[in-house]
UniProtKB/Swiss-Prot annotation:
The lineage of its organism: Eukaryota, Metazoa, Ecdysozoa, Arthropoda, Chelicerata. Glycans are attached at N47, N70. Salivary chemokine-binding protein which binds to host chemokines CXCL1, CXCL2, CXCL3, CXCL5, CXCL6, CXCL10, CXCL11 and CXCL13. Residues 1-24 form the signal peptide. This is Evasin P1090. The keyword Signal applies. It comes from Ixodes ricinus (Common tick). GO terms for molecular function: C-X-C chemokine binding. GO terms for cellular component: extracellular region.
Amino acid sequence: MEVKIFAFLQIAVLIAFSLHLASAGSKELSGPESSENSIEAAFCDTNCTEGTDGVWSGCSAGCFCVHVGNSTVGRCMTFNGVD
């Protein structure tokens, strides 16, 4: 019984150590994680509303409307850094 518990603990420590090594890699920014490739989401200065015809309006150029669930009021957002 004690041998099984000891073996289980050894395996658990080995797995935890392996996961740590995998996640503790280089912190240098590269590839898709690079800030050169990142985009930024920001709120615009306006809100938006859904009309009775189901069309959303109120966002200025370059912004789009986001809302939660079945709400008829939302906030306008934009993405910066998108080609």
